[in-house]
Amino acid sequence: LVVTAHPDDETVFSVTMFKITHELKGVVDMAVMTDGGGGFADAQLGAVYYGLPLTDSIIARTHLPMIRKQEILNAGKVMGVRNIYFMEQPDDLYSTNYEPYLYGKNWDISYIEKRLDKLLAEREYDFIITMSPRTGQHGHHITSVIMGLRAVERYKGSKKPIIIAGASKMNGNADPVLTGIPGIDISKINTNVPPFRLNRAYRFAENDKLSYKIVADWTIAEYKSQGAIQENAMHRTDEELYFYYDINPLNGTEKVKKLFEDLSKSGFLPAPKK
């Protein structure tokens, strides 16, 4: 289960999701917190494409929720997602203050918790993937992370899922460093466990023409209302990194290690060196 805040957040994990479903023949679902109605700041070209003045906040909040649902359904088809569960919380504004969401002023937290609890109980997921737990980011992102962590903490079944946090490494950049959100103990990353890695950038096929970055580009391309991600993320991420939360049992690392070893061996492999 991939837990995110907005349609398009999952593009950080898109190649992992694609390889799990298409190559390992696994199952991936998503839980998306907001309706996406606030994502209109970079919709200038999308407004032309959709024939609506989407940079107008009133019009955007009327039409963007449906538009972005369709966009994520299209992206989900690329990634092989089985089901997308929409939590329908308001995408009200950009703020790094997570408290109005986490403490239930702006979001219906009890509704989210009940739905996540039901999903985890019925679906018995092996893994939960969240966004990065770090300060200075969107309050919606932080709250979605905590919702996923608390759902795992509440889980009473015999098959508790392992929960990991995903991040992207852009071309030429240093590895992201994640430790958790200060003041929120449940978000602590086990820094003794190195991040698990998925390489999008290695080349394969005739004359090394292709890479799995193409899959990520396919998913990003579905978000025509979101100009910034298309301008800034297309073909720029070399690796997906996944960090191990401290709330997991230490022996669960072997399960995650096996997943990423299996992913590294699946699908198209690098051409042998000559």
Label for each model-derived stretch:
Residues 1-123, 149-150:
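Active-site rim/loop-helix segments in enzyme catalytic domains that contact anionic ligands
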Residues 1-3, 99-105, 109-274:
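Metal-dependent de-N-acetylase/amidase catalytic core
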